[in-house]
C-alpha cells in the first residue's frame, strides 16, 4: 500500500555544498549522511515536515546519477513513495504492466527500495521505499 511521499531526491555535484546551502538559506540540517557503495553515491537526508529532501552525489563516473548529471545537470532526480512492502508493490506493479528497474527490493538510504522505470510513470523515476 502506498502511504505518502517519502522524499524528493536531487542530484548534486558536491554534497557538502548542497548541505551548506540548505543550512545557510533554510536553517535545515541533514538527519543522515551515508555512502552507499553498491549504488555509487553519497547521500544526505534533510527532513522537512513529514517528508525529506535527499541530496545524492555520485562517487563513481559509471553510475546512473553521474550519467544524469552529465546529461541534465543538477536537479530533481527521483521521487520516492513510502510503501508497506517494497517487494509486494514491485510485483503488483509488474503484474499491471509497469516496467521496473528493480524486480526485488534492495537496501538504500530510505530503507528497502526499488525503482520503477520512468517510461511507466510519464518520465518520472519513481522509488518505492519501505522503512525497515
Where would I find each of the regions flagged by the language model?
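Vicinal oxygen chelate
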Residues: 44-47, 54, 81, 90-132
